[in-house]
């Protein structure tokens, strides 16, 4: 059934992720085969924050050996799936799991230590370079990328402290991974800080350019200085007049256009938007339907911003909405629904939301005639068979 939902809403592509440690299970092997058989192109990411506990016990990403362990895992995945998967990403949002896992302590392994963040950042970059080499050696013609959560980092106020804090977060969030991977150097604000963890030749090992830039984008960050935080900065609030989603994130579609242009100008890579969407307080109405107009409004404004960026020169090749289904979110469990398909968790019943039908129309229109997308976005959602 889920494969049919993909065909209806977004024919041609799905972005599932492997789980390190169980990726050779029959469940994931059969799943990959099933997607290909259903004429769905899988875009597979090797790492979505699920480090095996056994490796975590050995230091996880603070252990330099983790880079080679990851390369071995990439080689195994290439041999298992390379005959049916041609698009691989090494990591999903490395800035999130390193900064939030080792700096803020919000995600696993729950560490708050600025030095550990830098160590983890460097080792993840080494793992990326080693995995790119392994995948290219094992899968001829493979198309490779890394998926970055990237957004503008704006000061919460005009104070010099907040301005400096925003610049510091920008270096970690937006530059710590794509800069060494694509440009062969760390951002200026991180160059000296990462030096203690570098060995001769490391930047060359990391600098394994990929074929495309994967972008996850939701909203800009508003940043404030926070001396009590080990990182020296924290997250502030957007101005009061900025709309917010039900999860509290600012809704500012112009930030997506700004981000796409910045990526294009700095890295000159084809860009695929691999996550973009919003949480909404969805419920099944008396007619058995889910009317999620706020999500349609969000997607309309953000896809319009994306097409503005394309007209301004950004080389955007594709767009994936987050997400096909309501699912478990890292920071909020099942309390926030991002899907264009409603999932009744006790029964697992799927109910396409109003946004599902709107999005299916949008994708079909954009595929045939991109300039038609704004006109299409203004039309009410209709049922799609």
Residue ranges with predicted function:
Residues 2-36, 40-385:
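Active-site region of glycoside hydrolase catalytic domains
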């Amino acid at each position: 059934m889920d494969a049919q939902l993909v065909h209806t809403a977004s024919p041609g592509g799905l972005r599932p992720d492997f789980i390190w440690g169980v990726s050779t299970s029959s469940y994931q092997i059969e799943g990959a085969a099933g997607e290909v058989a259903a004429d769905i192109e899988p875009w597979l990411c090797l790492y979505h924050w699920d480090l095996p506990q056994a490796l975590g016990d050995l230091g996880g990403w603070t252990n330099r050996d983790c880079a080679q362990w990851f390369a071995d895992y990439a080689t195994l995945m290439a041999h298992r799936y390379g005959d049916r998967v041609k698009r691989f990403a090494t990591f999903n949002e490395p800035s999130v799991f390193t900064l939030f896992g080792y700096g803020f302590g919000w995600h696993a392994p729950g560490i708050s230590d600025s030095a550990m963040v830098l160590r983890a950042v460097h080792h993840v970059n080494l793992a990326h370079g080693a995995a790119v080499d392994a995948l290219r050696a094992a899968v001829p013609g493979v198309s490779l990328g890394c998926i970055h959560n990237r957004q503008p980092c704006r000061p919460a106020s005009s104070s010099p402290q907040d301005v400096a804090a925003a610049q510091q977060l920008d270096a970690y969030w937006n530059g710590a991974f794509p800069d060494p991977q694509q440009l062969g150097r760390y951002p200026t604000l991180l160059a000296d800080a990462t030096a203690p963890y570098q060995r001769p030749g490391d930047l060359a090992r990391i600098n394994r350019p990929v074929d495309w830039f994967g972008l996850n984008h939701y909203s800009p960050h508003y940043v404030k200085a926070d001396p009590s935080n080990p990182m020296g900065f924290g997250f502030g609030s957007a101005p009061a007049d900025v709309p917010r989603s039900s999860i509290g994130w600012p809704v500012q579609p112009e930030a997506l256009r700004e981000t796409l242009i910045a990526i294009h100008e700095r890295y000159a890579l084809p860009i695929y938007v691999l996550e973009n969407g919003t949480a909404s307080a969805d419920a099944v109405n008396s007619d058995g339907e889910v009317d999620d107009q706020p999500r349609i409004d969000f997607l309309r404004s953000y896809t319009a911003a994306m097409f503005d960026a394309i007209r301004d020169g950004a080389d955007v090749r594709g767009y994936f909405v987050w997400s096909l289904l309501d699912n478990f979110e890292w920071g909020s469990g099942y309390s926030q629904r991002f899907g264009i398909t409603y999932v009744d968790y006790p029964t697992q019943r799927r109910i396409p939301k109003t946004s599902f039908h709107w999005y299916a129309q949008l994708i079909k229109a954009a595929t045939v005639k991109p300039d038609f997308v704004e006109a299409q976005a203004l039309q009410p959602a209709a049922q799609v068979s």
